[in-house]
């Protein structure tokens, strides 16, 4: 995304509090923070002697991070905004958004512009730049389905690079940027390919039930209907992080092979599962946690949400260590009872 040049020195905020920059609302402090509004500022970091030798952390909405300690480095607050149609052909629109653009606002904008496709991903917290890192997904859709490419800056060199889907190596809630590329790049712009022929994604019962409750037959649903249904479902199930600190779903839904699933089903016939195209089986992590009796329980100021067992919350004053201790206790109980490993979605620092 073209950005105006910015040759001014980076403005550093010393001893910057981070509670307002993570959706858990966990108190932590960064040695420095800097607000990044232009790609050129990322590109110049490696030449700035004040920060070049320090650890660097790029933060968007802070919806996928748990701070267990202060950050002894510079936190780069990605505020690169903007959204535009960069081109279109007979089949699709190619839409670009800045890395710091709020994700939900971007999804709503695409609908307002008559370019549907992302509506199942409505109300997911965070920014556009964070979406490819996590390969966000919900209600039968992963971001990678509409991903075209992104521009990222390598922090150590200031070099801008283009990544296509193959280079991003997307997996389930995973990508190159969570593995080999972790901490190395800042995503400054993402381009999505939105087909002009809309294909509704209505494979999840929650969505069709919500449509039915609104008197809308699935085969008559519009993109706006699906968007509104998903927003209503998420608001009913998930706490607002502005009111109750959380990072959305804390654990990935585990994927196991067929043999392991057969053994598990023999022990737990009611296990909630979703067959995958490759023969593996995805399990509902929330069901596993609920069966272990964790829904609504707390360890100190960290707790499992009373309506959604996948969501861990900060009841007020919880530290990252508190959240991590709760997560580990849940992992232990699920492992002992079901022989299944739960993997956290957020990055714990």
UniProtKB/Swiss-Prot annotation:
EC number: 1.3.1.98
Entry annotation: catalytic residues: 173, 249, 345
Subcellular localization, as worded in the UniProt entry: Cytoplasm
Pathway named in the protein's UniProt entry: Cell wall biogenesis; peptidoglycan biosynthesis
The reaction(s) this protein catalyses: UDP-N-acetyl-alpha-D-muramate + NADP(+) = UDP-N-acetyl-3-O-(1-carboxyvinyl)-alpha-D-glucosamine + NADPH + H(+)
UniProt xrefs under PROSITE patterns: FAD_PCMH
Main subcellular localisation: cytoplasm
GO biological process, one term: cell wall organization
Cystine bridges: none
Residue intervals of the FAD-binding PCMH-type domain: 25-197
Gene3D superfamilies to which the protein is assigned, alphabetical: 3.30.465.10, UDP-N-acetylenolpyruvoylglucosamine reductase, C-terminal domain (3.90.78.10), Uridine Diphospho-n-acetylenolpyruvylglucosamine Reductase, domain 2 (3.30.43.10)
Superkingdom in the source lineage: Bacteria
GO cellular component, as recorded: cytosol
Keywords: Cell cycle, Cell division, Cell shape, Cell wall biogenesis/degradation, Cytoplasm, FAD, Flavoprotein, NADP, Oxidoreductase, Peptidoglycan synthesis
Any one Gene Ontology molecular-function term assigned to this protein's record: FAD binding
Cited InterPro entries: FAD-bd_PCMH (IPR016166), FAD-bd_PCMH-like_sf (IPR036318), FAD-bd_PCMH_sub1 (IPR016167), FAD-bd_PCMH_sub2 (IPR016169), MurB (IPR003170), MurB_C (IPR011601), MurB_C_sf (IPR036635), Oxid_FAD_bind_N (IPR006094)
Cofactors: FAD
Family: Belongs to the MurB family.
NCBIfam families: murB, PRK00046.1, PRK13903.1
Function: Cell wall formation.
The name this protein goes by in its record: UDP-N-acetylenolpyruvoylglucosamine reductase
